[in-house]
């Protein structure tokens, strides 16, 4: 038994490496209640101040936790299907070392959230339910990012070049280089490409039409307008406040040109392109945009005496980006995509200001599960925050408790923001939950749901 510094309870621990070199950690509290939570990021999360409190809380409630660290070669060899296999190996180890759990939950954030969703659809046999936080779905994500970045490249290049800041070719959005400029985790870049984009955004922001065009990119990409930390959440009926928020958000997004972790996603299929816009009608996308963003775009174009229809025509005439059939075959395999057909209950959370994964992916998932007749298996909740995966311990705890209530009774408890916030407070997890209504953040439908075949 190990007795660490508070707030961890006394626990037993097993650590090691799986056959592919992935590190793992298993912790079983002395007063284990039979529930096992698996998490892609448990091993690495133990040293992450934004995550460790959640794990402490789980153990304090009697839950065993088993999970991994992300593989050191993940930036070049990302494969969620292999990560799922690793989690089954981890469950084998757990059962051989301790005992068969009464219940197993798959829990995770970002890539771990994708793992949870994929398990619920394609590999549910050994898991009772999933809690997915800030989940990405690679092709969905790269396509929705491509839309906004394509608009930015087409409409903002003139400001960058016109100001003498560089050449049009500096503003790269796809087929990004493996030249060491990407962070080893696959998230974010340094060097000339993000620097060029920051300069382009600043140059465009100095012009009224440039500001309107930045807003158009956010609307067509279905990106959240408020993703920059330490900035106020803008009023949705204030076009100027929304535009300022989008500009600050664009500067943050510039650290991942073409979309968060694009290099990692492209590398997964031998560098082949997984996103495309060859069949996209951006005029139709504007009609389908979030109403507040669409109104802001129209207001800003009118204020700048800009030609919105002309810019849409310009987008229509610009050569598009095609996907590789090899890449799409890779991403179509079980475990690498989700289509909204869970076989077990799913509780999904997303932050409205997530800069890595727009909250609109969750809206697309909601539409998909309803269309597939799976709506009763799924509940979702939106959190008022910027960042990525920095969920409060209370938010994590109430999501798990909500899932357990569903498994124990067969019915979902109330998952309205008010009910979730109240139950989170009652759990006394040490911080406060920030669940919010979606009012004003809706879109008629998500543009980039991908169902292979």
PLM region descriptions:
Residues 1-453:
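C-terminal His-loop and adjacent cap/lid subdomain of alpha/beta-hydrolase
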